């Protein structure tokens, strides 16, 4: 575990506080108002989404790969959502059976995973047919000048907030086999110009559609949301 990872976890809430007050919190609330049933959230971070989930959520499972973030997430869950289940797991290798969840949530996470296409395939795998992916994510700008700026300064963004702001995330969602049903191009408040482009939206897993190939076979099971045994 790097000092940078520890520092990022310690300072994340302070870094993002201005953006939350200026509109990011409202984006989260609007997105998660539609969450229902068995929900999985990847990259739960410090738990900023917890209080946005409503009574329609039957079960909430949150994954987080980084121990410093995980400790803060566990404290937030205890305070805001004690019925939620928290696990340490990367988005690229979710420890759940196929078809375990009704809704998956990713907010400012797909920009920071090591392998975005694999993470999206995993989300599609654990969602039931007709399941939904709800997302707020950074996006490579459609404006050529801004996109060039994103490419030029992405190293700085990775250094400060551990993410790539120039990924073609919407294309990646579609490539993973999701059908994008709603997308809104937004600007992240209080962010530098090259980090502002983002999307808020939802995508669905086609009912009874063939699955995208995975790197290893996993058994299929209907009951939700059961963790795969270790080993």
Which ranges hold each PLM region?
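A short acidic, Gly/Pro-enriched loop at the edge of an enzyme's catalytic core
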Residues: 92-104
């Amino acid at each position: 575990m790097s000092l940078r990872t520890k520092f990022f976890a310690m300072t994340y809430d302070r870094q993002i506080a201005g953006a939350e007050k200026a509109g990011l919190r409202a984006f989260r609330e609007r997105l998660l108002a539609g969450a229902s049933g068995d929900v999985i959230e990847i990259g739960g971070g410090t738990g900023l989404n917890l209080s946005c989930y409503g009574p329609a959520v039957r079960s909430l499972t949150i994954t987080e790969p980084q121990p410093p973030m995980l400790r803060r997430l566990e404290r937030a869950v205890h305070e805001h959502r004690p019925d939620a289940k928290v696990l340490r797991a990367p988005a690229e290798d979710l420890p759940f059976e196929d078809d375990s969840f009704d809704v998956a949530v990713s907010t400012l996470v797909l920009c920071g995973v090591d392998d975005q296409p694999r993470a999206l395939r995993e989300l599609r795998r654990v969602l039931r047919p007709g399941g939904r992916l709800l997302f707020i994510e950074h996006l490579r700008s459609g404006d050529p000048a801004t996109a060039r700026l994103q490419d030029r300064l992405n190293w700085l963004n990775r250094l400060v907030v551990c993410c790539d702001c120039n990924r073609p995330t919407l294309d990646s969602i579609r490539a993973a086999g999701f059908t994008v049903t709603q997308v809104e191009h937004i600007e992240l408040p209080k962010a530098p110009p090259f980090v502002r482009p983002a999307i808020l939206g939802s995508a669905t897993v086609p009912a009874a559609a063939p699955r995208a190939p995975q790197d290893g076979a996993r058994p299929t099971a209907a009951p939700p949301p059961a963790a795969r045994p270790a080993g």
